[in-house]
């Protein structure tokens, strides 16, 4: 969920961890990973207007018996030791909770990449089959060293990531400015299947 008040853009996301592997320690590690990467982007300039960015992100473990309320702010991720399937939805999926490719979890924390998907971004790599029958991933041209194009823990968040998200948000709020009293649904911009990066 994204909102704009004056020149402040607030990006709000509650990430709820599910499954037997979900722990408070993981929740803290995931949240730190987001803030250490996405949280470094604190301003955004568009059409000569500079906006401040507030990252209102909370990662926690689901409470026992908690219902999965899909309200555009909550995102539910099942913690697994291997992501066996990919779901192209905004608010529900899987996330790896262990290390990968002989590296530790701290080196390969996948949360900032997965958070990019929550924000509506797509992968910037393609899967190819090699001569030995195994698969590898090739980063798309122009996306080297980017959080959406590299292996977990290797890419960085860049302003061009926001260029795929925030212009649409700003247009939304410019269009519906001063209409929230009669159209309260315009108060927030929700990322969904219609406005995700194609």
Q: What are the residue ranges of the model-derived segments?
A:
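Surface-exposed charge patches in extracellular/virion surface proteins
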Residues: 1, 24, 60, 196-198
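Short, exposed beta-strand/loop patches in secreted or surface proteins that constitute
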Residues: 1-4, 67-68
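Fold-level signature of zinc-dependent metallopeptidase catalytic domains
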Residues: 3-29
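A generic structural signal for short, non-catalytic loop/turn and secondary-structure boundary residues
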Residues: 4, 50, 72, 140-143
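Structural recognition of the beta-strand scaffold that forms the well-ordered cores
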Residues: 10-14, 116-118, 146-150
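Solvent-exposed loop/turn segments at secondary-structure junctions
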Residues: 17-20, 34, 125-126, 154-155
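Metzincin-family zinc-dependent endopeptidase catalytic domain
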Residues: 24-136
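Metalloprotease/metallohydrolase-associated module, dominated by Zn2+-dependent proteases
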Residues: 100-106, 128-198
């Amino acid at each position: 969920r994204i909102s704009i008040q004056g020149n402040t853009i607030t990006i709000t996301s509650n990430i709820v961890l599910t499954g037997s592997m979900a722990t408070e320690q993981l929740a803290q590690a995931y949240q730190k990973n987001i803030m250490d990467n996405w949280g470094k982007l604190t301003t955004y300039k568009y059409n000569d207007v500079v906006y401040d960015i507030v990252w209102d992100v909370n990662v926690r473990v689901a409470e026992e018996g908690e219902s999965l309320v899909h309200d555009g702010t909550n995102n539910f991720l099942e913690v697994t030791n291997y992501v066996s399937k990919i779901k192209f939805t905004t608010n529900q999926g899987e996330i790896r909770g262990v290390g990968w490719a002989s590296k530790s979890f701290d080196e390969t924390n996948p949360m900032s990449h997965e958070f990019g998907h929550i924000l509506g971004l797509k992968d910037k790599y393609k899967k190819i089959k090699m001569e030995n029958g195994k698969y590898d991933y090739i980063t798309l041209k122009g996306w080297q060293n980017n959080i959406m194009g590299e292996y977990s823990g290797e890419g960085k968040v860049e302003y061009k990531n926001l260029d795929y998200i925030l212009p649409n948000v700003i247009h939304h709020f410019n269009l519906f400015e001063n209409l929230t009293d009669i159209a309260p649904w315009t108060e927030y911009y929700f990322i969904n299947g219609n406005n995700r990066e194609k």
